[in-house]
Amino acid sequence: MEQTVYLQLEDGTCLTGKHFGAPLKEDVIAEVVFTTAMTGYTETLTDPSYYGQMVVQTFPLIGNYGVNPKDFESKGIHMSAYITREWCSYPSNFRCQMDLDAFLKQQNIPGIYDLDTRYLTRLIRERGVMNGRLTAACPDKTSADALKSFAITDAVSHVTCKEAYQIPSPLPRHHVVLWDFGAKENIIRKLHALNCDLTVVPASTTAARILSFSPDGIMLSNGPGNPKDNPSIISELSRLCKSGIPIFGICLGHQLLALANGADTEKLKYGHRGANQPVKDLLTGRDYITSQNHGYAVKNDSLPDNAVLRFINLNDGTCEGVSYQDFPGFSVQFHPEACGGPHDSEFLFREFVALMERRA
């Protein structure tokens, strides 16, 4: 028998749906966000940047091709709960190893389906991102007030690696230190494809320790949470900017690099999450479709004199990328390594390699 469960938002809205996935043994409280991606749900589920969030899939039917571990962007699911209109209980794909329900159970993540995800998405767009509670008991309206105090804290420490490790390339040309704030596997794949040896280090690593590896370049990964919650990382990163070593930041890495250079960040009303976000390259005038997953952005008017705004979002004009003039570094808010998603901006990895080659 299907269990009725409830999604309560901090504004008092309560939606009813049906439970799937792991047993809902206790209430789950998290930030409720939506993604507009039509495919790549396995990559979405295993993206560490969703730590502390419940994710709404705007596409109505999820799970058609099942789940295959080769599609994982990390070792498991980091989000708190999964929300969809309908899930496919009989997936059809030769690569399928399990269905969506079995995967959620394996990862101990509850889900809710058969609720109006279109209404929920429009609500978030109109009122902004809200905290929510997934519960098996019909909630009292007065309990919604308690949700407002929830905040995602210390997020990066929950998704970073615990100790440094090496990923050698068969044909190494460059040595890159990947500073792991919740790195996606496809960042590693893209760097490997460009013959980069990798040393992956935890978020708590100092600048001195990173420099001790004698890297040709430093990659700042994606990750979850408010970038301003990482003052020690920002401080260490500011030291690395003076080293002369090429630096490339993606998503959270982009925000941290901006903060390390004196810029500011702000929380967006409902963020950019999906595989269809248009950006403009102000350097070339070209437009690209990009994959994105972020709730914060670098403030355009806060960029310091050594920073040049390179990419902007064509929907709202927010900062999507910065180039730095006094050291060999650049960063983007979107995901050039997108999987699944558009590959329009993969060339940025080659630009990073070119910076390393010019310095060699």
Task: Report the location of each language-model feature.
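Short clusters of small/polar residues that mark proteolytic maturation junctions
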Residues: H19-F20, F59, Q292, S323, ...
